[in-house]
Amino acid sequence: MLGLEKKLTLYGFNNLTKTLSFNIYDVCYAKSEKAQKAYIEYIDEQYNSERLTKILCDVTEMIGAHVLNISKQDYEPQGASVNILITEEALPLHLIDESCNKGEGIAAQRDTIHAHLDKSHVTVHTYPEYHPDNAISTFRVDIDVSTCGMISPLNALDYLIGSFDSDIITIDYRVRGFTRDVEGKKFYIDHNITSIQDYIDDETLKKYDAIDVNVYQSNIFHTKMLIKEIELQNYLFNKDVNELLPKQRLEITNNLRKEMIEIFSGMNIY
């Protein structure tokens, strides 16, 4: 990782806010409406609020933060949300607001969980989607990690990518505010970064085509990633690829690729 290990000597608290917005799309082929609904039910169960809570708690630990409060909710007919409030330093119990549950026993006790940080937070929302006239279903996960102080959400990128079936990924990272060194000089960013890709493992990047759109003077960084290879069996829901004729395999693969390209581009092309 670049730049995160080199620290400034600051005056007072680090007032920089670092926000990572992470969206992944999982694409699946399910021909009939029945199969599409079954896929949505499957993905909804796979990524319910319990599992999402564990993922976010792992992210919190990876970036060196501590959970103050967790709230979670599963929705009907589908979808889930988890919100975690986090703190950079572990707080003595007498300083923690009595409304904070610290994430203890939440999964076993309640249907809704919210995690709360004193100055930072982690949230996730899921968006399953299908249309009866289209044999391709999609599942989007929207994760936001916002931190204040020295901790950086960039440390959790590889884990987040690996936690989901990530066909298309869009990542936004921005730094806001300023902090001062001991001599009073203002700093608007406290680590080196030229691209979000600098914080993604090379083995992960090999699997994707990636492009950057960065506004360096505004400390705004944007990366989009599109999976290179389509292993068709991985995209068929409850169907064996060997049941398909070669012509069908090619047609389905092309349709999957077209859907991915449109999502990656953010526009209707075909």
UniProtKB/Swiss-Prot annotation:
Lyase recorded as keyword: yes
InterPro entries named in the record: AdoMetDC_fam_prok, S-AdoMet_deCO2ase_bac, S-AdoMet_deCO2ase_core
Site (Cleavage (non-hydrolytic)) residue list: K119, S120
Keyword entries, A-Z: Autocatalytic cleavage, Decarboxylase, Lyase, Polyamine biosynthesis, Pyruvate, S-adenosyl-L-methionine, Schiff base, Spermidine biosynthesis, Zymogen
GO terms, molecular function: adenosylmethionine decarboxylase activity
Needed cofactors: pyruvate
Source organism superkingdom: Bacteria
Note accompanying the cofactor annotation: Binds 1 pyruvoyl group covalently per subunit.
Reaction it catalyzes: S-adenosyl-L-methionine + H(+) = S-adenosyl 3-(methylsulfanyl)propylamine + CO2
Enzyme Commission (EC) number: 4.1.1.50
Pathway where this protein functions: Amine and polyamine biosynthesis; S-adenosylmethioninamine biosynthesis; S-adenosylmethioninamine from S-adenosyl-L-methionine: step 1/1
Residues at the catalytic site: S120, H125, C148
GO annotation, biological process: spermidine biosynthetic process
Residues bearing PTM Pyruvic acid (Ser): S120
A cellular-component GO term for this protein: cytosol
Processing and modification events after translation: Is synthesized initially as an inactive proenzyme. Formation of the active enzyme involves a self-maturation process in which the active site pyruvoyl group is generated from an internal serine residue via an autocatalytic post-translational modification. Two non-identical subunits are generated from the proenzyme in this reaction, and the pyruvate is formed at the N-terminus of the alpha chain, which is derived from the carboxyl end of the proenzyme.
Family designation: Belongs to the prokaryotic AdoMetDC family. Type 2 subfamily.
Summary of subunit composition and partner proteins: Heterooctamer of four alpha and four beta chains arranged as a tetramer of alpha/beta heterodimers.
Functional note: Catalyzes the decarboxylation of S-adenosylmethionine to S-adenosylmethioninamine (dcAdoMet), the propylamine donor required for the synthesis of the polyamines spermine and spermidine from the diamine putrescine.
Name used for this protein in its record: S-adenosylmethionine decarboxylase proenzyme
Species whose genome carries this gene: Alkaliphilus oremlandii (strain OhILAs) (Clostridium oremlandii (strain OhILAs))
